Swiss-Prot record:
GO molecular function: tubulin binding; unfolded protein binding
Name of the featured protein: Prefoldin subunit 5
Keywords, ordered alphabetically: Chaperone
Region (Disordered): 144-163
């Protein structure tokens, strides 16, 4: 992200288009980042919901399907519905109580919410800049068209005065 200020009024249409293209690429990057954060937040929220469901009284001994991969499930049985294996990253798991596991995932959700707000603010700012650049492109095109029209009128006056 560039923090350098550019005077858009001093750029020609080609330069304005290049700046707009750069802003559009940055905007696309931030939009994709926001989507990734939203997906991760959804997964952590789902973990919280699953822990709450499994840890309810009476669920001990219940049968369930345990995901072994994205498309493979293994039959399982809840032995202790008060303890959970929590993925803390890079393939490491830690046993936590239901309350501690929920707190762990809630902390992650809160962090992602904060980051999402920051990215949304950046997206709004980039969108406003992009719209401003579009307006400058239109103005530059109008100025260019007016200059060409004026030049043609002067050319026609010269031709009519020499004829």
């Amino acid at each position: 992200m560039s923090s350098q200020k550019i005077d858009l009024t001093k750029l020609n249409p080609e330069q304005l288009n290049a700046v707009k293209q750069q802003f559009d690429q940055e905007l696309q990057h931030f939009t994709q980042s926001l989507q990734a954060l939203t997906m991760a937040k959804g997964k952590f929220t789902e973990c919280i919901d699953d822990i709450k469901t499994v840890s309810q009284a009476g669920n001990e001994g219940q049968k369930l399907l345990v995901p072994a991969s994205a498309s493979l499930y293994i039959p399982g049985k809840i032995v202790d519905n008060k303890k959970f294996m929590v993925d803390i990253g890079t393939g490491y798991y830690v046993e936590k109580s239901a309350e501690a596991a929920i707190a762990f995932y809630q902390k992650k959700v809160d962090k992602l919410n904060k980051e999402s707000v920051q990215i949304q603010d950046i997206i709004k700012e980039k969108t406003q800049y992009s719209l401003s650049i579009e307006a400058q492109i239109r103005q530059a095109a109008i100025r260019q068209h007016e200059a060409m029209s004026k030049q043609q009128q002067q050319q026609q006056k010269k031709e009519s005065s020499t004829a």
